[in-house]
Amino acid sequence: MDALIGDFADFHKECSARTALHLVNGKFGKVSVWKHGPTQKSFFYKRIEHKHFNAIEPFVHHLMKFNKYFLRLFYSLHSLREHLLVMDYIPDGDLFDLMQTEPRLREPEISLIAYQLIDALQALHKHNVVHNDVKLENVLYRRFEQIYVCDYGLCKIAGSPSTFEGTVDYFSPEKINKHAAAVHFDWWAVGVLLYEISTGKHPFKLDQDESLDVETLHKRQIQLDVTFPADFDNPFLEEFICFLLGYCYDYRAHSYEVIQKNTYWKSIVHWKQR
């Protein structure tokens, strides 16, 4: 441990804060960007108070360290006040940032994001881990190249007790009903995210600026059909999103095995393999 601390101290001395970059801090952590002088490489520094720190976060970093869709972790250290994670920096921001400038994406970009995000989550699910907070802000994106799933502090081992943690907008019916954590929590959230990037709206909000509570969201999940703008011209994508967001679990795309059978997914795989 002393050697690790010494190594980090030497590393940090060679870094300078990139103060011109304004990042939005998460609910449980403060994020800054530092540049390492000798290599000119930038890193995320994430500082988390001990009361908010979840050991599963560095665990998932370690678990997925060979997967290109997850952030590499270089240091994980703690002091009396906080825990520090030093990770790869992705310069282009997240999907939420992108949607502020381009409120509606088009093909083939949507297919690229869908393919990589589903591939990333399936790799995580193979380890029996649920991300549990899939949303626009937690998908970093090098435009037209690659996504990176980030923020693993709310990850759950499948089968563990579930609570109302995460972002309400992406809660599945089962999460609202406090079922045990399961991979289908993530697949529902993928459906919401794909709807957002392809329409610029939320599937269950009457107004994009509306703040949903759990009760209102659940009522609309039951009562409302997912509808699309009149000019939406991709029937296969529309059907796929509706398949992910069907209220009835038995008729929904609740697993990777079911997703693989969908026409839109098959077309993406074929496109990627050309």
UniProtKB/Swiss-Prot annotation:
Protein kinase domain ranges (all copies): 17-265
Amino acids binding ATP: L23, V24, N25, G26, K27, F28, G29, K30, V31, K46
Active site: D133 (proton acceptor)
Pfam families the record matches: Pkinase
Physiological role: In vitro, can phosphorylate histone H1.
Regions crossing the membrane: none
Keyword entries, A-Z: ATP-binding, Kinase, Nucleotide-binding, Serine/threonine-protein kinase, Transferase
KW Kinase (keyword) present: yes
Protein name: Serine/threonine-protein kinase 1
MF-aspect GO terms: ATP binding; protein serine kinase activity; protein serine/threonine kinase activity
EC number: 2.7.11.1
Family, per entry: Belongs to the protein kinase superfamily. Ser/Thr protein kinase family.
UniProt catalytic activity: L-seryl-[protein] + ATP = O-phospho-L-seryl-[protein] + ADP + H(+); L-threonyl-[protein] + ATP = O-phospho-L-threonyl-[protein] + ADP + H(+)
